Regions:
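A short, exposed loop/beta-hairpin motif centered on an aromatic-Gly-Thr core
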Residues: 10-22
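A short, charged, amphipathic alpha-helix used as a generic interaction element across diverse proteins
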Residues: 19-35
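Short aromatic-glycine-(Arg/Gly/Cys) micro-motifs in beta-strand/loop hairpins
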Residues: 1-13
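Short, mixed-charge low-complexity intrinsically disordered segments
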Residues: 36-111
Length: 111
């Protein structure tokens, strides 16, 4: 059993899937939608530190599975994405030339 958790702007949605393939398809669909949403601009300024869109995580898609599988995607305020493994100790998944963050995540999990 695989669980996909989507966190966006204070909302949390959870879904369960029987196979890794189904979970990855659902993650890819949600990541695509988040990447192409209209995101906020920079926040903060005079008193607080200014956060540019690339520094803001506007959506996070997390995957949990058997044998302590933990991985996911962060969608940034500028629409860029990063793939990671782990939960507490996250490590970024390096993308190959021309590869999307989702493709890198899929490659890492299905290898």
């Amino acid at each position: 059993m695989y669980a996909v958790t989507v966190r966006t702007r204070g909302k949390v949605e959870r879904e369960r899937y029987e196979s890794l393939r189904e979970a990855l398809v659902a993650m890819g669909r949600r990541a695509y939608l988040l990447e192409h949403e209209d995101h906020t601009g920079a926040v903060g300024g005079r008193i607080l530190r200014r956060f540019e869109p690339v520094s803001q995580v506007v959506g996070r898609i997390e995957l949990r599975g058997p044998r302590r599988l933990r991985a996911g995607l962060d969608v940034r305020g500028d629409g860029s994405t990063e793939a990671f493994r782990g939960r507490v100790r996250r490590s970024l998944i390096v993308q190959r030339r021309g590869e999307s963050a989702f493709a890198a995540l899929e490659r890492e999990l299905t290898a």
